[in-house]
Amino acid sequence: MAHNKRLKAARASVDSTKFYPLTEAVALAKTNARAKFDETIEISLNLGIDPRHADQMVRGLVSLPNGTGKTLRVGVFARGPKAEEAKAAGADVVGAEDLAELVQNGTIEFDRCIATPDMMALVGRLGKILGPRGLMPNPKLGTVTMDVKGAVTAAKSGQIEFRAEKAGIIHAGIGKASFDADKLVENIRALVDAIQKAKPTGAKGTYLQKAALSSSMGPGMRLDVSSLTV
């Protein structure tokens, strides 16, 4: 009952006809994060693309300046010195054939997967398992690399992956409700900047079409898209 009252009050505070400036929306999302846990602040962006065309896919990595507030588990496929480098950098699980066997058996204890180039013949066999989960290492995303230390450090320090879904929408968690409002704004603008830079050459018309912001359990607010960039 208390939860329903909180949700009702949160919904009542949002004007569904308004396009909120980013700073106002962030402040309201923080206020409406009334759950007993530290809610994630989430943004969705509708892009003017057609992801059915290979040349209009939007995908990339961005390091949020203030992190996400979430501990990311990192798995690394590597051998020898590179495996040791991964462990020293803080990777949660490191291995080769042994790690591949765990994945094949359904034990996936990581949220980001990194591999050295020489491991891709092995990792490629796991594509049907890792691919649908968005975990397949990709050289374009910097997750197939010899710089294992750099990739692990980036993942652990607030780097997130963004990817447009079939309808051309990107969803991302950009921090916790406990973050200062200005830190959330900085994170959102870093994400939007990265998405702008990833604009496909084949995309026509308005690229950033719509945007909405909410906390995990709170109501969504439509955003004034022009306020998303500095």
UniProtKB/Swiss-Prot annotation:
GO cellular component labels: cytosolic large ribosomal subunit
InterPro entries: Ribosom_uL1_bac-type (IPR005878), Ribosomal_uL1 (IPR002143), Ribosomal_uL1-like (IPR023674), Ribosomal_uL1/biogenesis (IPR028364), Ribosomal_uL1_3-a/b-sand (IPR016095), Ribosomal_uL1_CS (IPR023673)
Domain of life of the native organism: Bacteria
Keyword tRNA-binding in annotation: yes
GO molecular function, one term: rRNA binding
Keywords recorded for this protein, A-Z: Repressor, Ribonucleoprotein, Ribosomal protein, RNA-binding, rRNA-binding, Translation regulation, tRNA-binding
Annotated GO biological process: regulation of translation; translation
Listed NCBIfam families: rplA_bact
HAMAP family (UniProt xref): Ribosomal_uL1_B
Family from the record: Belongs to the universal ribosomal protein uL1 family.
PANTHER family named in the record: 54S RIBOSOMAL PROTEIN L1, MITOCHONDRIAL, LARGE RIBOSOMAL SUBUNIT PROTEIN UL1M
Subunit organization: Part of the 50S ribosomal subunit.
Free-text function comment from the UniProt entry: Binds directly to 23S rRNA. The L1 stalk is quite mobile in the ribosome, and is involved in E site tRNA release. Protein L1 is also a translational repressor protein, it controls the translation of the L11 operon by binding to its mRNA.
Protein's recorded name: Large ribosomal subunit protein uL1
Species of provenance: Granulibacter bethesdensis (strain ATCC BAA-1260 / CGDNIH1)
Name of encoding gene: rplA
